[in-house]
Amino acid sequence: MSSNPFNPFEAALNWQRKTLENMTDAAETSQIADERLELMESVEVGQTPSDVVYEENKLELLHYDAEATGIEVAEEDKEAVPILIVYALINRPYILDLQEERSVVRRLLEAGHDVYLIDWNEPSRLDQHLTLDDYVNRYMDNCVDVVRERSGQDAINILGYCMGGTMSVMYTALHKEKVNTLGLMAAGLCFDHTGGVLEEWGSEEYYSPQDVVDTFGNVPSDMLDIGFALMDPVENYVTKYIRFAENMENEGFVENFGRMEQWLGDGIDVAGEAYVQFLEDVYQDNKLYKNELELNGKHVDLDNIDMPVLQLMGEYDHLIPPEASKPFNDVIASDDTRTIEFSTGHIGLSVSSSTHADLWPEVAEWYSERSTGGEEVDIEVESPEDDTVDQSESTDIEVDATDDVDADATEDDADAADEPADVDSVSGIGPTYAERLHAAGIHSVADLAEYDAAELADIAETTESRAQDWLDQL
């Protein structure tokens, strides 16, 4: 038996003591509650100085001013090739510039990059018929041309976030000559039971985006906000407010909480027709990943994406799980791809302290290593009414190879030439397609040639046009 038997009087006293302590804490907290709420309402966001250098309809193209920000970068460390950030059509882009120490924009500026950002702003009822073609081939293309003209560069770097990343893929596939590198941040690209709850909710079995647009015209931000919040209802409606109450005495915590709440409550409507296209073509039919997507009759051909590609994804992203992004690298032509999966969530990629300490310096370096800058060119940017622009030809540089070749290496190359080339030596056949082909007994290029496009498309689970592209290379 226990040497300390249960004492009901002591237990009652302990309970009363604990209750009194909790009441005292609550009373003290209530005394500062009004002050903390005022502090939350007074926080500022998006404070990095910028200039609007181009406007069209509602959109504004921002150019960030490192000098006005107080960021000093040595002349030799300044990058010639600028970065254009393409944000989603949902929410405001200042999540990428939330506060000084958690600003993606500032991290890039500090690394010497010249940074631009497209702020789409909110569409009116007059914009409900804007399509993805309008956003990608008109608005984005005009912004890219402005950045090219201002920088004197024939091709620029792009960084697309979330839906903006998906649209950046579309743009790059259609205008590859204008894109030096493509960075994608939590971009939804592959929806084959890989997109988590959002993909299931958006399934044509349960949801009709056309019905929403027929009812509202543009998709209301309140409807979108509630939908996103309900993906994690306990956290969004209970836990975070308990956490706020427990940390109310911490001014820094309250300020950060206020900034995030301001952004979460600052949603914008989405143009109706673009929303329908995005949900039906990208989510429900997975046309982008299958290389079947068309914008206004133009094929968004993933084989055109042959420049360096970087993918950033959050390990705990419940909006765009890593599995909705990773497979994309296998279906593009680029042989310079990199994937970074960081231990954070969808929003954490842009605002968590750990990403700013460890991830964004690495991203800035990735862009720097691939942004040597080409010959400056003069670019004519047409007025917003025009959909096309004159394009300058890229500069071709010939490099002479050395005549000194190691004899052993030459012999090794000769031996290798005698071996049948594997199917993954064909441009456009990445690891995923190669694995499917291998499983069907197709290991070499010679094996591949024994099949027609329809048979290969069925085996590799791709389109006949892509399979025919493989055969055309043989």
UniProtKB/Swiss-Prot annotation:
In its UniProt record, a GO molecular function of this protein is: nucleotide binding
Q: What class of enzyme is it?
A: transferase
- Biotech: how is it used? PHB and PHBV are desirable bioplastic due to their biodegradability, biocompatibility, and mechanical properties. However, PHBV has better mechanical properties than PHB.
**Cystine pairings recorded for this chain:** none
Q: Where is the AB hydrolase-1 domain?
A: 82-348
Enzyme Commission designation:
2.3.1.-
Task: Kindly identify the residues recorded as the active site.
Answer: 162, 317, 346
Q: What happens when the gene is disrupted?
A: Depletion of both phaC and phaE genes leads to complete loss of the PHA synthase activity.
Part of which pathway?
Biopolymer metabolism; poly-(R)-3-hydroxybutanoate biosynthesis
Query: Where is region (Disordered) located?
Result: 368-404, 410-429
Instruction: Supply the Pfam families for this chain.
Output: Abhydrolase_1, HHH_5
- Could you tell me the keywords of this UniProt record? Acyltransferase, PHA biosynthesis, PHB biosynthesis, Transferase
Q: Which family does it belong to?
A: Belongs to the PHA/PHB synthase family.
Q: Which PANTHER family match?
A: POLY(3-HYDROXYALKANOATE) POLYMERASE SUBUNIT PHAC (PTHR36837:SF2)
Q: What does this protein do?
A: Involved in the production of polyhydroxyalkonic acids (PHAs), which are water-insoluble biopolymers used as intracellular energy reserve material when cells grow under conditions of nutrient limitation. PHAs are composed primarily of 3-hydroxybutyric acid (3HB) and 3-hydroxyvaleric acid (3HV). Required for the production of poly-beta-hydroxybutyrate (PHB) and poly(beta-hydroxybutyrate-co-beta-hydroxyvalerate) (PHBV).
Q: Report the NCBIfam families cross-referenced here.
A: PHA_synth_III_C
This protein is called Poly(3-hydroxyalkanoate) polymerase subunit PhaC
- Organism of provenance: Haloarcula hispanica (strain ATCC 33960 / DSM 4426 / JCM 8911 / NBRC 102182 / NCIMB 2187 / VKM B-1755)
